[in-house]
Design a protein with these regions (language model features):
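Carbohydrate-interacting regions of secretory-pathway proteins
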Residues: 19-196
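Sec-dependent N-terminal signal peptides
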Residues: 4-15
């Protein structure tokens, strides 16, 4: 009986540690920081990023840092839709140091990993995986980062699995990007992170 009770206590203590945490509350940008002049706002419970008058890069980063985690989110691209999800990243002004899991129009390597202000493309998905993207519809992306390994999925399709020492040394927040050039609008919902 003591072993059973101890097992139950261990499970109850561990559950909150592996529970999903919402990154977006559906009503405001509490817990986030805006970088740049591009537009980030809430519309009918959805998080929206949209090109502003400067047509520059813009970022929305979490106030908290996340090292090892499993992130799921949904996005819907409108217009050009070029965006991304940064991991273990820091932002100064509109310069981000870190790694982006690409969110882009068809044929532009959604799910691949790009290192900003560094080595550029680290890995792109195989071309046939591009059909997993549903332009103009809701898409589900999953990103798992543990140590020096990153994996991404798009609508349950495995996109990449990559190991990199530099990523393993990274520290920082999760950030959403709006690309420069103007004419971009992306809607986001159900951003859930599980710290590991």
């Amino acid at each position: 009986m003591k072993k059973f009770t101890l097992s139950i206590i261990c499970i109850l203590i561990t559950l909150p540690l592996i529970a999903q945490e919402p990154l977006f509350n559906g009503s405001d940008l509490d817990g986030w920081n805006i970088h740049g002049t591009e537009l980030w706002y809430v519309d009918n419970g959805l998080l929206v990023c949209e090109s502003g008058p400067d047509k520059g890069y813009g970022y929305l980063s979490t106030s908290n840092y996340y090292d090892d985690f499993d992130l799921t989110l949904e996005f819907k691209q409108e217009s050009n839709g070029n965006s991304g999800v940064f991991i273990r990243s820091t932002v100064e002004g509109t310069k981000v140091s870190g790694w982006q899991v690409e969110v882009a129009p068809p044929g532009s390597d959604t799910g691949g990993v790009y290192e900003s202000y560094g080595r550029g493309w680290l890995i792109k998905p195989e071309k046939e995986k591009d059909k997993a993207l549903k332009m103009g519809e809701w898409n589900t992306m999953r990103i798992r980062v543990v140590g020096d390994q990153i994996e991404s999925w798009l609508n349950d399709t495995p996109m990449i699995k990559f190991v990199d020492k530099k990523i393993g040394q990274g520290k920082g927040s999760i950030a959403l990007q709006i690309h420069d050039g103007g004419g971009i609008k992306v809607r986001w919902r159900n951003l859930l992170v599980t710290p590991l």
